[in-house]
Design a protein with these regions (language model features):
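Extracellular/periplasmic catalytic domains that process cell-envelope and extracellular macromolecules
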Residues: 1-4, 31-33, 92-93, 111-112, ...
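Extracytoplasmic ligand-binding site segments that recognize negatively charged/polar headgroups
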Residues: 1-95
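Periplasmic-binding protein-like
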Residues: 69-74, 80-81, 113-139
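Short secondary-structure boundary segments
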Residues: 13, 42, 103-104, 164-165
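A ligand-binding cleft/hinge motif common to bilobed small-molecule-binding domains
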Residues: 92, 97-116
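Non-transmembrane alpha-helical segments in soluble domains
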Residues: 27-30, 57, 72, 88, ...
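Mature extracytoplasmic/periplasmic domains
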Residues: 126-127, 131, 136-195
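Conserved C-terminal helix/tail region of periplasmic/extracytoplasmic solute-binding proteins
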Residues: 189-220
């Protein structure tokens, strides 16, 4: 695994200020002023949305009554969109106040000059999904492939990649040096919560069925 992507909110600070809100926790998302103002993609087809649903489970208890009670309260404020990138692009464009999304998507917009949005890690805690590099069995040049994987997982390689892409990815080597002006905060500055990946993976179909049934009952 060479980098991870943390669950975040993308918050339009101008619209947030107009509403007189401070959005930094899951409870803040329940404000009635945010009805129809929070974007999420469809967890049935979007890994970004599934990760956000998984993080709610991590904060409130995996597949617990407390988690589902929270989700039921949140659903009236949600707008489900077909594209995970819309959850930060449409917020940056001023169409919505908040998007439930992933850090590197928002970070890329910020790096490119978007100054009306922020990456908000929920103060309740966040979790991340991992991205791996793998050696293909019986590949023609395994030694070269191994050397490449070793490099991109090394502090030297990840420091070079951080400098190249402007600090918009969270690399996994603890000795990676952040480039000057990196958009993302250090992992040590973030509150992390453990995600029960085994349970969520084994019960994904049932959890999504629960989500779909609940959404139909709450929103129609």
């Amino acid at each position: 695994m060479n980098h991870v992507s943390a669950v975040t909110f993308c918050v339009n600070e101008e619209l947030e200020a107009k509403l007189g809100l401070t959005i930094d926790s899951y409870e803040d998302l329940l404000d009635p002023a945010l009805k129809g103002q929070i974007l999420i993609s469809d967890p049935n087809s979007s890994s970004a949305a599934w990760n956000n649903l998984s993080n709610i489970m991590a904060v409130y208890g995996t597949d617990s009554d407390a988690a589902w009670d929270y989700i039921a309260k949140l659903m009236p404020n949600l707008v489900i969109v077909g594209s995970s990138s819309a959850c930060f692009k449409s917020v940056q464009q001023g169409e919505y106040v908040c998007g439930l999304t992933y850090e590197d998507g928002v970070a890329t917009l910020v790096k490119d000059g978007a100054d009306n949005i922020r990456i908000q890690y929920p103060v309740d805690g966040t979790s991340a999904s991992g991205f791996a590099a793998a050696l293909i069995k019986n590949c023609p040049n395994p030694d070269n492939a191994k050397a490449m994987i070793d490099f991109i997982c090394s502090a030297e390689g990840q420091t070079a990649m951080t400098a190249y892409q402007g600090g918009t990815l969270r690399f996994t080597n603890e000795n990676t040096e952040f480039a000057e002006g990196s958009v993302l905060p250090a992992s040590s500055e973030i509150k992390w919560v453990p995600r029960d990946v085994t349970y969520l993976t084994e019960n994904k179909a049932a959890i999504l069925e629960h989500w779909n049934d609940l959404y139909a009952a709450v929103v129609g």
